[in-house]
């Protein structure tokens, strides 16, 4: 039967439409697969675009003449980023392959998980730095089983809690939530024994971590431990809201980089980074250290820090962190479906930190450290001691600029992290900056300050003489209650100048008795003793003498034999204040802050006086003359000072520290007529302060013999 015309027409229309759709499909297919093949292929595989932080280089540190002290070196680092894994790629397998490669190639990788399976499972918390302890503790409080056990232990030991900050309410352990309680716990107190006492054993923690990280039983314990070390670090970054890749190994060589670059190790990437490089082995205590953030606070987050950032930990690295820290850049990275990076570009270029120019003179710093080390070595060999220390400070009179600041023994900044445990346990305490953080009894170096106080307060004059029979006693005391002068036969008649030159204890005890302790301390404070010096790094302020058990300490405080203690930096600053007529300048390390290219000055050091003690010219000349007599005409240290290239005033001090042990103390200024520098030295366990005379002469000569490069240095140029 023949089809009707309408049906035939409908069929033809439908066939034409089908042919049209097919034609369109073929055209699109040809256009996609042939004409625009590369373009659409690229689009199909560029599936992920993300932003990555680019660390800025820290600023350079130089001395006052532009000599480089600290700079940066370019390095290669191996990172691991789980987001670069292919879909379906097992993260644990990828980590194990990468760590195995590192082990086979002899590349040390970052593994700070303090859990060892060598022999019997055991903790290694006691070997961690405070930064590492803080991070480990943050993980423990995030892991439910350990959080519960530690919270119980801390409630039983509330002394482990941090003291509340100013304005904060103290936490009630009984009502606080576990997480809040542990956030307020002092992580530095974490030890192997604390964990064990809290019921957290190595075996338990290992099992809990395997469960938390979802490690199957297919992994041996040793392989699981390798994986957990990396997963632990990745977890820390997640807890710190840090999306950056984990730096698995630093300073890897080019040969290792080539193994990673072939794409066989998913998640791995080689990045360029920088590390601190030290152009000198001197000034370690001044320069300080950099490292990881130990307490990742909300304040640091708000200031743009990430948990993995490097930050100044001590010294000027910490004091001038805001200048030295650069501004990180941002880089956009495109990753295809195979986990390969297909493109990257900077959205924000990183900006390096500023250049910090210190007041320190490197050549003088070297001379000071070397001569101190020689003196300490000589006495250690003589006395068979190995725990003796020394310190020195040199200040520019009239500005407060610190030209040199030394603490002996010192350490090597380039290896301090590796050597940390040894340095920490060394009885000589090389990590301690004795010049700023170790207060000492001043002994007779305080006598010039007492002389100023006595003359300016009016209890004596430059012409009054006091007879020294070889002892001093209270007017109402019996002869048996006297205090002997160091010269038992007595000095006879002494005025203020001769009393300084001859270091007459009797004279100064009488002055202390006349003034009283409050007046003495008032003048000592005005000269900078027992007060903050103004230095930008951490320091001890020492302490003024106080009366004990109802006994007046003024006579003994007047010649430095009471209970007062001052740092070497304070002693140098007091001498600088005295010889400048009472202008008390802040001791400081910052000279200028410059832009990275040295084209712009950003900031300068503080050179305004903290206070002024108006010392009369007659007082000043009487005191200076007494100190000059100490170095000339048969004075106690006249012999060594014959080798001094300029005239100088000085005063020694000897302070008993228990039994027959004494510390030697020495202060000086030079030149005599127009003083430029003030010097203070302390030598622990020395027979007397006079043993430091040759050391002081070496330092003064080094200052005046040095090449004054500051006056000949072209602008914006660094010198070697």
Indicate residue ranges for each PLM-predicted region.
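Solvent-exposed, polar/charged alpha-helical surfaces in well-ordered, non-transmembrane soluble domains
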Residues: 92-100, 254, 258, 262, ...
């Amino acid at each position: 039967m023949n089809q009707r015309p309408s049906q035939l027409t409908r069929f033809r229309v439908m066939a034409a439409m089908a042919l049209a759709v097919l034609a369109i499909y073929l055209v699109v297919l040809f256009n996609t697969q042939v004409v625009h093949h590369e373009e659409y292929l690229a689009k199909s595989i560029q599936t992920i675009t993300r932003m990555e932080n680019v660390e800025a280089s820290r600023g350079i540190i130089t001395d006052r003449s532009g000599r480089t002290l600290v700079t940066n070196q370019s390095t290669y680092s191996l990172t691991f980023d789980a987001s670069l894994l292919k879909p379906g790629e097992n993260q644990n397998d990828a980590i194990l392959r990468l760590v195995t490669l590192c082990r086979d190639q002899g590349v040390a990788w970052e593994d700070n998980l303090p859990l060892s399976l060598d022999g019997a499972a055991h903790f290694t918390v006691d070997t961690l730095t405070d930064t590492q302890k803080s991070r480990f503790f943050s993980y423990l409080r995030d892991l439910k089983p350990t959080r519960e056990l530690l919270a119980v232990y801390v409630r039983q030991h509330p002394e482990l809690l941090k003291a509340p900050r100013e304005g904060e309410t103290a936490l009630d352990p009984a009502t606080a939530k576990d997480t809040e309680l542990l956030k307020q716990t002092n992580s530095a107190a974490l030890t192997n024994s604390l964990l064990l006492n809290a019921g957290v054993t190595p075996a338990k923690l290992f099992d809990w971590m395997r469960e938390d990280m979802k490690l199957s039983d297919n992994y041996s314990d040793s392989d699981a431990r390798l994986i957990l070390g990396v997963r632990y670090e990745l977890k820390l970054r997640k807890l710190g809201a840090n999306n950056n890749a984990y730096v698995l190994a630093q300073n890897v060589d080019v040969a290792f980089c080539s193994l990673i670059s072939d794409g066989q190790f998913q998640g791995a990437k080689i990045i360029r980074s920088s590390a601190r490089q030290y152009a000198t082995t001197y000034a370690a205590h001044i320069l300080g250290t950099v490292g990881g953030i130990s307490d990742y606070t909300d304040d640091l987050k708000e200031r743009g820090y990430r948990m993995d950032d490097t930050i100044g930990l001590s010294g000027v690295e910490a004091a001038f962190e805001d200048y030295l820290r650069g501004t990180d850049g941002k880089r956009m990275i495109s990753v295809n479906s195979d986990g390969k990076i297909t493109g990257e570009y900077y959205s924000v270029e990183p900006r390096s930190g500023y250049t910090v120019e210190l007041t320190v003179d490197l050549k003088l710093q070297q001379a000071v450290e070397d001569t101190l080390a020689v003196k300490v070595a000589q006495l250690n060999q003589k006395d068979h001691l190995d725990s003796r220390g020394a310190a020195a400070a040199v200040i520019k009179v009239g500005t407060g600029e610190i030209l040199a600041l030394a603490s002996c023994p010192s350490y090597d900044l380039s290896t301090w992290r590796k050597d940390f445990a040894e340095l920490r346990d060394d009885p000589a305490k090389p990590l301690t900056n004795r010049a700023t953080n170790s207060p000492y009894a001043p002994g007779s170096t305080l006598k010039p300050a007492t002389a100023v106080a006595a003359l300016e307060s009016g209890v004596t004059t430059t012409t009054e003489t006091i007879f020294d029979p070889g002892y001093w006693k209270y007017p109402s005391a019996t002869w048996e209650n006297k205090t002997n002068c160091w010269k038992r036969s007595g000095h006879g008649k002494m005025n203020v100048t001769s009393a300084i030159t001859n270091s007459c204890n009797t004279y100064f005890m009488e002055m202390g008795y006349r003034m009283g302790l409050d007046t003495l301390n008032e003048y000592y404070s005005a000269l900078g003793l027992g007060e903050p010096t103004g230095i930008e790094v951490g320091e001890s302020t020492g302490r003024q003498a106080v009366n004990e058990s109802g006994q007046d300490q003024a006579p003994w405080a007047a010649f430095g034999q009471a209970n007062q203690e001052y740092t070497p930096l304070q002693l140098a600053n007091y001498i600088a204040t005295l010889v400048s007529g009472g202008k008390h300048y802040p001791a400081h390390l910052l000279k200028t802050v410059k832009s990275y290219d040295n084209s712009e000055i950003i900031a300068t050091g503080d050179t305004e006086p903290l206070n002024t003690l108006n010392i009369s010219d007659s007082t000043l000349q009487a005191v200076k003359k007494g100190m000059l007599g100490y170095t000339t005409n048969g004075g106690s240290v006249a012999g060594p000072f014959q080798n001094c290239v300029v005239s100088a005033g000085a005063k020694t001090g000897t302070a008993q520290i228990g039994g027959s042990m004494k510390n030697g103390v020495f202060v000086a200024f030079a030149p005599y007529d127009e003083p430029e520098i003030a010097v203070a030295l302390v030598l622990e366990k020395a027979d007397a302060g006079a043993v430091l005379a040759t050391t002081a002469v070496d330092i003064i000569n080094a200052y005046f013999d040095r090449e004054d490069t500051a006056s000949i240095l072209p602008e914006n140029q660094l010198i070697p």
